[in-house]
């Protein structure tokens, strides 16, 4: 199969021909300021390919600044001018990132089609990372399924580049195709040696993904010797309740066997852990909910909303627990399955905004108030957004970022008018940042900001809702990413995730 494919947008070409027939001599030009150069494009063409550009050019001047490289954006301009794009393994990542962040649907779908056709042993990890970083479930789910199926065939050096987070998703699955559980152990040991920072993280993999009961006697011996090198043999808790993986379960079906006891190897097994305090109860309930969920505390009740299941599908499930009685409560499911939503309290209702559904980022918004039998459909966003920062003020709901890592845009929902509008963009992006409403101002704190193409995690901005202006405030003393935030007395407290 060719590693280069050309995609033609026939519907767009028809619109393009109509525009050319009606060409005027005073056509308006938009200047796109990229990293490394300036790209010129006709405004009429630019706004026809994406609602994002339509909104940006409507509310700003004819200069647009993007954080993408000049060469990468030339492929986008070629499509805008001709309706044709040629995709290969070298340019697919940049084209896909731009099309996702700027909502160019044809290019996005073309990249998805190209990547799904070209997942191989050498490209699977790259395609997985492209899909995940752009929030595209279809891409990274296909890549993960491929990696699990070909795990022992893919070159180890390629798999060693995966992070702890990536490996948790891949190795925990019962569909991981290995000849024995020893294969998993040997890979974890190799991964621990690949980088010094992997050593501590590898103990997490051992406790969370390794199916100890199905190691061979040699595998258990190997594990014990490896742990002993770091003085961990008595401090690692292993889960003995997992079933065998599908690829080797036939060897354990209808068979009585004697397992070597953990005490033989001086390893403590994770049994039925008794709940020792109230916080443990909440933690236990929370850990059983789906990852990538939204969370909010309302009237002393903790709500965990949406997320993904073990098959990595977005879900509509909600877990709610009374933090006073520590009793789990019933809450109706969402109308739309979603992971990575924005969640906030506004007008005594829980608002769930955007997120990622089965087909990618969502515009949908829904709300619910305790006592209601189902969620209520609300006016959708102007742009699909996932993992945005969201905060309510007296009469407005603010949704910040969520289109891409470098997104600086905000949308404002007016409760009185029941409409969304585009607000004044931030000075910097704050991907993975946190948000607060304090003394009449909105604060965007930390997260990933791009300054002269350098990654910065300490920026703080303050927004005045009355003047619709952002100002840059004093930076954080430590870089923060995906931190938590709370108001304590008269101060904003940032908790966790110092980023280095």
UniProtKB/Swiss-Prot annotation:
Q: Which UniProt keywords apply?
A: Kelch repeat, Repeat
Q: Which residues form the BTB domain?
A: 27-89
Q: Where are the Kelch repeats?
A: 301-348, 349-395, 397-440, 441-490
Do you know which InterPro entries this protein is assigned to?
A: BACK, BTB/POZ_dom, Kelch-typ_b-propeller, Kelch_1, SKP1/BTB/POZ_sf
Tell whether Flavoprotein is among the UniProt keywords: no
Coiled coil region boundaries: none
| Gene3D superfamilies linked to this entry | 1.25.40.420, Kelch-type beta propeller (2.120.10.80), Potassium Channel Kv1.1, Chain A (3.30.710.10)
PANTHER family membership: KELCH PROTEIN (PTHR24412), RING FINGER DOMAIN AND KELCH REPEAT-CONTAINING PROTEIN DDB_G0271372 (PTHR24412:SF489)
In which family does this protein belong, per the annotation?
Answer: Belongs to the poxviruses Kelch family.
State the name under which the record lists this protein.
Protein C13
Organism in which the protein naturally occurs: Swinepox virus (strain Kasza)
């Amino acid at each position: 199969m060719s590693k280069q494919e050309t995609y033609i947008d026939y519907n767009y070409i028809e619109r393009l021909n109509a525009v050319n027939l009606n060409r005027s001599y005073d056509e308006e030009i938009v200047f796109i300021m990229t990293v490394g150069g300036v790209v010129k494009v006709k405004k009429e063409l630019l706004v026809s390919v994406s609602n994002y550009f339509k909104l940006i050019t409507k509310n700003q001047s004819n200069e647009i600044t993007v954080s993408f490289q000049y060469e990468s954006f030339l492929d986008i301009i070629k499509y805008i001018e001709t309706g044709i794009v040629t995709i290969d393994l070298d340019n697919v990542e940049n084209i896909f990132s731009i099309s996702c962040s700027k909502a160019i649907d044809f290019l996005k779908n073309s990249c998805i089609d190209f990547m799904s056709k070209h997942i191989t042993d050498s490209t699977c990890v790259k395609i997985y990372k492209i899909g995940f970083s752009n929030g595209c479930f279809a891409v990274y789910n296909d890549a993960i399924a491929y990696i699990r199926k070909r795990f022992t065939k893919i070159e180890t050096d390629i798999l060693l580049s995966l992070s702890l987070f990536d490996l948790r998703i891949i190795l925990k699955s019962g569909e991981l195709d290995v000849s024995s559980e020893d294969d998993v152990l040997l890979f974890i040991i190799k991964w621990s040696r690949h980088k010094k920072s992997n050593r501590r993280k590898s103990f997490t993999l051992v406790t969370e993904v390794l199916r100890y009961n199905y190691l061979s006697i040699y595998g258990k011996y190997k594990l014990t010797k490896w742990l002993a090198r770091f003085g961990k043999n008595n401090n690692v808790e292993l889960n003995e309740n997992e079933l065998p993986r599908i690829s080797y379960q036939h060897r354990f079906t209808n068979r009585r066997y004697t397992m070597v006891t953990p005490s033989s190897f001086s390893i403590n097994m994770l049994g039925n852990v008794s709940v020792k305090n109230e916080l443990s109860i909440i933690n236990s309930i929370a850990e059983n909910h789906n990852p990538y969920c939204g969370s909010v505390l309302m009237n002393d009740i903790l709500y965990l909303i949406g997320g993904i299941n073990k098959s990595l599908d977005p879900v509509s499930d909600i877990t709610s627990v009374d933090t006073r009685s520590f009793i789990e409560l019933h809450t109706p499911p969402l109308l739309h399955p979603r992971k990575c939503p924005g969640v906030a309290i506004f007008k005594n209702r829980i608002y769930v905004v955007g997120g990622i559904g089965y087909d990618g980022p969502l515009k949908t918004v829904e709300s619910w108030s305790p006592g209601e039998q189902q969620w209520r459909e609300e006016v959708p966003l102007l742009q699909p957004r996932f993992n945005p920062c969201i905060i309510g003020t007296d009469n407005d709901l603010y949704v910040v970022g969520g289109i891409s890592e470098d997104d600086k845009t905000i949308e404002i929902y007016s409760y009185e008018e029941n409409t969304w509008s585009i607000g004044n963009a931030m000075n910097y992006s704050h991907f993975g940042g946190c948000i607060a409403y304090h003394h009449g101002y909105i604060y965007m704190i930390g997260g990933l900001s791009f300054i002269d193409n350098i990654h910065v995690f300490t920026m703080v901005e303050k927004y005045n809702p009355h003047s619709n202006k952002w100002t840059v405030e004093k930076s954080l003393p430590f870089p923060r990413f995906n931190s938590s935030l709370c108001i304590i007395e008269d101060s904003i407290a940032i908790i966790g995730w110092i980023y280095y």
